[in-house]
């Protein structure tokens, strides 16, 4: 994770924000007399929040992990996005 000082972040706030957005990577901002903070794009933040929400339920987390294991062991089926969107909902 890229790390910059509070002073550098303040002097280059717009460029620092653009870097976080373009690189899809958080930036650690340190302070001499306080806790550090992390700057990240709204897209990255929303992604973390969604992941946390999906993993909050132990049953859902287990289903997701089982699906990942299934794909890693070659049991997955590749589909085009159109096929996936057109799947019936029950």
Swiss-Prot record:
Annotated keywords: DNA-binding, Repressor, Toxin-antitoxin system, Transcription, Transcription regulation
UniProt-listed InterPro entries: Antitoxin_Phd/YefM, phD/YefM_antitoxin, YefM-like_sf
Gene Ontology terms for molecular function: DNA binding
Statement: the UniProt record of this protein carries the keyword Transcription regulation: yes
Pfam families: PhdYeFM_antitox
Domain of life: Bacteria
Gene3D superfamilies the UniProt entry points to: 6.10.250.330, YefM-like domain (3.40.1620.10)
Disulfide feature: none
Annotated function: Antitoxin component of a type II toxin-antitoxin (TA) system. Antitoxin that counteracts the effect of the YoeB mRNA interferase. YefM binds to the promoter region of the yefM-yeoB operon to repress transcription, YeoB acts as a corepressor.
Subunit structure, as described in the record: Forms a complex with YoeB which inhibits its toxin activity.
Family: Belongs to the phD/YefM antitoxin family.
Protein name (Swiss-Prot/TrEMBL): Antitoxin YefM
Organism of derivation: Shigella flexneri
The encoding gene: yefM
């Amino acid at each position: 994770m890229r790390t910059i000082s509070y002073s550098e972040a303040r002097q280059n706030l717009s460029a620092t924000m653009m870097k976080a957005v373009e690189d899809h990577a958080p930036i650690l901002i340190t302070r001499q007399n306080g806790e550090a903070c992390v700057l990240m794009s709204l897209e990255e933040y929303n992604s973390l929040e969604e992941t946390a929400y999906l993993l909050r339920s132990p049953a859902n987390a287990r289903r997701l992990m089982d699906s990942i294991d299934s794909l890693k062991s070659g049991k997955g089926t590749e589909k085009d996005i159109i096929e996936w969107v057109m799947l019936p909902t029950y």
